[in-house]
Amino acid sequence: MSVYGLQRLYIAGAHADATSGKTFDTFDPATGELLARVQQASADDVDRAVASAREGQREWAAMTAMQRSRILRRAVELLRERNNALAELEMRDTGKPIAETRAVDIVTGADVIEYYAGLATAIEGLQVPLRPESFVYTRREPLGVCAGIGAWNYPIQIACWKSAPALAAGNAMIFKPSEVTPLSALKLAEIYTEAGVPAGVFNVVQGDGSVGALLSAHPGIAKVSFTGGVETGKKVMSLAGASSLKEVTMELGGKSPLIVFDDADLDRAADIAVTANFFSAGQVCTNGTRVFVQQAVKDAFVERVLARVARIRAGKPSDPDTNFGPLASAAQLDKVLGYIDSGKAEGAKLLAGGARLVNDHFASGQYVAPTVFGDCRDDMRIVREEIFGPVMSILSFETEDEAIARANATDYGLAAGVVTENLSRAHRAIHRLEAGICWINTWGESPAEMPVGGYKQSGVGRENGITTLEHYTRIKSVQVELGRYQPVF
């Protein structure tokens, strides 16, 4: 018997049975308990979702921007009213501590919907005079039906981040959550419907990567926004382009550098480094997992980091005092433990953690101790590859130029940060770092107003911020001639 029973698709404003005959299970990563059996969408179900999205989108786009704004604001109110219940669901599905899901996951998703609800009325075109009797004007029109494909680390937040600009601009969205954390997107769909979003404007189809491939290749979809790993992102982008030259937004992986200079406030730097590696058990795409520390302060910095790691409270996610939970799946647990073994084998110095937590209530969950490696080299796998778990690699450097060169020596370019009291150095270093999201003397906050996205193989396009709306609209140019037409022949 599962906790939440059978979960279906959400199409045309209501829960709907899948036609594939297939299901998959989702488990509580802290206890191993079966949470739900989930129906997997078929190709026919995706077609049905696209058809209902087209119909709903026409009604949604015909509304005034102010009407759409009011409906989205009502959805925000409902999300905030139900924050605690949604946070508990997210806690069970992801394994995150309840203190975290209550304060972050739903809150930041609602903030982004509120932000774009406020911008819906600001979508406008231009008027360009050509001659006294002729001018051009432009219209920003919605793309139509968009697809969102989410990751398992921030299920409801990602669903909000992808749907908010799409809906504000007059589009419909078909959202596929990760099969690892499939539950909260259905609650968001219910909230949108209750708020007044027309049937079909936000549909949810469940399933594994094969369902994501169906969405990416579907000719009736105009844009795909994907969050996940680099290799999967490349496949999604290839399918999207080969099928119908879709617009794409890709928020992919990272191996982000955090540079601590010798003039830094070391207590602050240690606080930042621990947050940048162990928040959400290290399952954050922007984590600063390559920690470069100037040689003169390395020992003092390491001492402070280890003191803070010792204070991390791993435990039951439902305990309000817990601030460190399990990994989201058994597959991720095996992957992270494999990287830890690799770090040991390649000669990194294990300073903390380095093993699975198995005592007492940890035995049935997917917990890995917060792990810190010192004396790391740039050629180690734990330094080069994205782990997506609670593993910090500390490296030393001598000069600013050296730190920048080594920080940039990666195929990734999602995030970067510096800790220094020297304002000139801070900006100089940030301007040289090849990353799309950067922080000075802080780490990790991604407010609605801040564009989020990467350089190099960390992504294409941006989420959040004003400019994202441009990527959910297309420009129509119209020339108007008020005077006599001048024939060519």
Curated annotation (Swiss-Prot):
Top-level enzyme category: oxidoreductase
User: Which positions in this protein are listed as binding K(+) 1?
Assistant: T26, D93, V180
Q: Which GO terms describe its biological process?
A: glycine betaine biosynthetic process from choline
Any Pfam family from its record, for instance, is: Aldedh
Tell me the PROSITE patterns matching this sequence. Answer: ALDEHYDE_DEHYDR_CYS, ALDEHYDE_DEHYDR_GLU
**Pathway named in the protein's UniProt entry:** Amine and polyamine biosynthesis; betaine biosynthesis via choline pathway; betaine from betaine aldehyde: step 1/1
Which residues of this protein are annotated with the site description Seems to be a necessary countercharge to the potassium cations? E247
Which reaction is catalysed here?
Answer: betaine aldehyde + NAD(+) + H2O = glycine betaine + NADH + 2 H(+)
**How, per the record, is the cofactor bound?**
Binds 2 potassium ions per subunit.
* Top-level taxon in the UniProt lineage: Bacteria
Binding of NAD(+) occurs at G150, A151, W152, K176, P177, S178, E179, G229, V230, E231, T232, G253, C285, E386
Write down which residues bear the modification named Cysteine sulfenic acid (-SOH).
C285
Query: What's the EC number here?
Result: 1.2.1.8
Q: How does it assemble?
A: Dimer of dimers.
**Briefly, what is this protein's role?**
Involved in the biosynthesis of the osmoprotectant glycine betaine. Catalyzes the irreversible oxidation of betaine aldehyde to the corresponding acid.
What family is this protein classified in?
A: Belongs to the aldehyde dehydrogenase family.
* Name of the protein this chain belongs to: Betaine aldehyde dehydrogenase
Species this chain originates from: Burkholderia pseudomallei (strain 668)
